[in-house]
Swiss-Prot record:
Chain segments carrying region CPSase: 1-194
Disulfide bridge partners, by residue number: none
UniProt keyword Transferase present: no
Reaction it catalyzes: hydrogencarbonate + L-glutamine + 2 ATP + H2O = carbamoyl phosphate + L-glutamate + 2 ADP + phosphate + 2 H(+)
Associated pathway: Amino-acid biosynthesis; L-arginine biosynthesis; carbamoyl phosphate from bicarbonate: step 1/1; Pyrimidine metabolism; UMP biosynthesis via de novo pathway; (S)-dihydroorotate from bicarbonate: step 1/3
HAMAP family: CPSase_S_chain
Lineage, uppermost ranks: Bacteria, Bacillati, Actinomycetota, Actinomycetes, Mycobacteriales
Catalytic residues (UniProt): 273, 363, 365
Species the sequence originates in: Corynebacterium glutamicum (strain ATCC 13032 / DSM 20300 / JCM 1318 / BCRC 11384 / CCUG 27702 / LMG 3730 / NBRC 12168 / NCIMB 10025 / NRRL B-2784 / 534)
Any one Gene Ontology BP term: glutamine metabolic process
Annotated ranges, domain Glutamine amidotransferase type-1: 195-390
Family that this chain belongs to: Belongs to the CarA family.
Function: Small subunit of the glutamine-dependent carbamoyl phosphate synthetase (CPSase). CPSase catalyzes the formation of carbamoyl phosphate from the ammonia moiety of glutamine, carbonate, and phosphate donated by ATP, constituting the first step of 2 biosynthetic pathways, one leading to arginine and/or urea and the other to pyrimidine nucleotides. The small subunit (glutamine amidotransferase) binds and cleaves glutamine to supply the large subunit with the substrate ammonia.
Protein name per Swiss-Prot or TrEMBL: Carbamoyl phosphate synthase small chain
Length: 393
């Protein structure tokens, strides 16, 4: 393995620290450590996004996951103060696996390097990996428990490292949204004239979501995961929103019950990603774990109501069971599977035929990613407008 001798101020020389990526099935990859040096454990998943690594790494939906980048070189644009998707700039990925770490930062907005930011936040990374071989393995065998071991930790017997990896908690059955949610309620005010107030449940919300609402004149009250429905009534919301987030939706029973209360109260509802799975469960649908998930910023999705195809940003390892255009009865009226992925037919959106509640599995807030699906926010505002007119507000 060739060694890059470029040095970042205050961090480890690139290529100087041996490291291993160890999978639970015993497969091991040799590389070099960067960022923090030590051990990290998580579920190994891959993203096909060619840009936006900062947005990916600060997305709370990646909590407890080691992210493998398929793009061959990472770090070119450094790190800046504007593109974080977590509220406090926290990196949520458990670790980062790459082929080549850029030796120089080349972006006018950069305030530091990827290497420096990871070291500062204690995030362990490994480079010099044959990521093509690794991604093929994950594609064929599925996402798997993994660990990155660098420095002194990499000197332990591989058999011992494999056992450490195997003994970590599984993603299936994990209720992780409470681990990434805000501790207290906070508010993002509307830009210009305030049209509506939305209560947004933070299950791992990305910061571009309230920005999308704010730009449309919507005041967003962001509440912690599992906040009782009775507690949000004080805000007199025009609508309720459920965000993206990590973990297994089958373990989120409290949030499912809350959404059922929202629907029973006939309050307009919109959900994305984890929120889509929660709405589906409230409708009586089942969820399952995908083999290797959808993670990227160019995933094609078909809207079976309009026939339109959107290119979407996605990050999910679980999905709802259903088929394109499927109609079914719920406690709240007839529902329909509105969207599916053109790559594999996975359910990407559901709605009540009345239009009062809808959700999508992908990320219309587009950070990073295309803006094809941003009209979903306009749709929610129009739904709240119509509801206000009906109620004579």
């Amino acid at each position: 393995m060739s060694k890059d001798t470029t040095t970042y101020q205050g961090v480890t020389e690139i290529g100087s620290v041996p490291a291993y990526l160890v999978l639970a099935d015993g497969r091991t990859f040799t590389g070099f450590g960067f960022g923090a040096i030590g051990t990290t454990l998580g579920e190994a998943v891959f993203t096909t996004a060619m840009t936006g690594y900062q947005e990916t790494m600060t997305d709370p939906s990646y909590h407890r996951q080691i992210v493998v980048a398929t793009a061959p070189q990472i770090g070119n644009t450094g790190w800046n103060d504007e593109d974080n998707e977590s509220r406090d700039g926290k990196i949520w990925v458990a670790g980062l696996v790459i082929r080549d770490l850029a030796a120089r930062v080349s972006n006018w907005r950069a305030t530091t390097s990827l290497q420096q930011e990871m070291a500062g936040q204690g995030i362990v990374g490994i480079g010099g990996i044959d990521t093509r071989a690794l991604v093929r393995h994950l594609r064929n065998e599925g996402s798997i428990a993994a660990g990155i071991f660098s420095g002194a930790d990499a000197q332990r017997p591989v058999e011992e490292l494999v056992e450490i990896v195997k003994n970590q908690p599984a993603m299936t059955g994990a209720n992780l949204s409470v681990e990434v949610s805000a501790d207290e309620t906070y508010v993002i005010e509307a830009e210009g004239e305030e049209r509506h107030t939305v209560v947004a449940y933070d299950l791992g919300i990305k910061q571009n979501t309230p920005r999308r609402f704010s730009a449309r004149g919507v005041r967003t009250v962001i509440v912690p995961a599992e906040t009782p429905f009775e507690d949000i009534k004080q805000y007199n919301p025009s609508g309720v929103f459920i965000s993206n987030g990590p973990g297994d939706p089958a373990a989120a029973d409290v949030m499912v019950d809350i959404v059922r209360e929202v629907l029973e109260a006939d309050i307009p509802f919109f959900g994305i990603c984890f929120g889509n799975q929660i709405l589906g469960r409230a409708f009586g649908m089942e969820t399952y774990k995908l083999k290797f998930g959808h993670r990227g910023i160019n995933v094609p999705v078909k809207n079976h109501i309009t026939g339109k195809i959107d290119i979407t940003a996605q990050n999910h390892g679980f999905a709802l069971k259903g088929e394109a255009g499927q109609e079914f009865e719920t406690d709240f009226g007839t529902a329909i599977v509105t969207h599916t992925c053109l790559n594999d037919g996975v359910v990407e959106g559901i709605a009540l035929k009345s239009g009062r509640a809808y959700s999508v599995q992908y990320h219309p807030e587009a950070a990073a990613g295309p803006n094809d699906a941003s009209p979903l926010f306009d749709q929610f505002v129009e739904l709240m407008d119509a509801d206000a007119q009906k109620k004579g507000a």
